[in-house]
Amino acid sequence: MKSILDIFTRGFIQVQKTVFFATALLFAFSLFTQAEMVDTYQFQNQDDRTRAVELAKSLRCPQCQNQNLVESNSPIAYDLRLEVYKMVDEGKSNQQIIDKMTARFGDFVNYKPPFKWNTALLWLLPVALLILAAVLLYFSNRKKQFSEKVVAQQLENDEIISLPSTFGSSPRKQGEPSKLSKGKVNSKIYFVLFTLLIAIPATYYFSLDRFSRVQQGEQSMIEQHNQNVEMNDEHKNENVIEKLQNKLRTDPNNAETWLQLGEAYVQNNEFDSALVAYSNAEKLSGSKPNILGLAATALYYQAGQQMTQKVEQLLNEALAKDKNEVSSLSLLATIALENRQYQQAGMYLQQLLDSGNAAVDRRSVIQRMKMLDFLQRGEKGQNP
């Protein structure tokens, strides 16, 4: 028996060690993952890096369940985290960055919001109602005890005065309905207090503009995210454009290079030059669906993000030749998103995923679909 117990004890200790090691390993991986999210951004010096990370930790992700911008892996937290890092790199103070974030999302984004009377009222109102309920219950119980004493004294006096009967004294029978009615009254009071305790704070909370502020900030982040997806860094594009131009000088009849040059011009907001490049590609290889879709995108942004007749015509031609044309579906999803047609935008993005086209940036599409889901839940009145 002793040997069996020893074996069991050693086995239990070994299991504990294994669990501890696995926990430590997972914790180490989590730290590494968190550090990796920070290290991908190159700061000018270590002090800026430390300040940026601490500042990002003090800001709440608008989309997550009580996670800061460093802890969260959501797309909006990633974008906000990079925005904080860039503003720190530009030399902006912590207060300037916090003011910009709160102006967009409200005080919800700040883990340490400034004191405001409406916030204090929101937190103190349930406490005040609890205290009020406790006071009312205390006086109600005291009144009940006093009434019971009076009734008991009255019954005692009546028993002394009146003769006992076979069925008991009549005063005791008269006292019972009174107790039942008082019990019903007390139950109603408790129910009313409990209802008020829940209804008043909830009504006041939903009367605040916190959710609408967060939703507006989320919408602005969606628009900014779309622009970041469409437009890359200007200086980087200048180098790409120069390389492509040199390549075309040696081989001007390469349609694929003309397409790449057009995309680089679009990313650099040079839409006129992009349309010239797409036109040259079309002359060399014909009116292919991808060329038409890229040209429609350039025309759309050239017109100030307006759906002109020419843009619509090019989109229809591209999708008639290839219903899963990537640039056309991406543009239609962007237009639907800007018009707050989230369900329609989601359908276009899902079509991109289902197309199986290798040119589709699946990670970017999935991130946009998650944002669409968040916005749809927001329009339905659900808490972000």
From Swiss-Prot:
UniProt cross-references to SMART domains, sorted A to Z: TPR (SM00028)
Name recorded for this polypeptide: Formate-dependent nitrite reductase complex bifunctional subunit NrfFG
Main location: periplasm
Residues that hold heme according to the record: 61, 64
Ranges for the TPR repeats: 221-254, 255-288
Family statement drawn from the similarity comment of this UniProt entry: Belongs to the CcmH/CycL/Ccl2/NrfF family.
Annotated GO CC locations: periplasmic space; plasma membrane
Listed Pfam families: CcmH, TPR_CcmH_CycH
SUPFAM superfamilies named in the record: TPR-like
NrfF as annotated region, ranges: 36-144
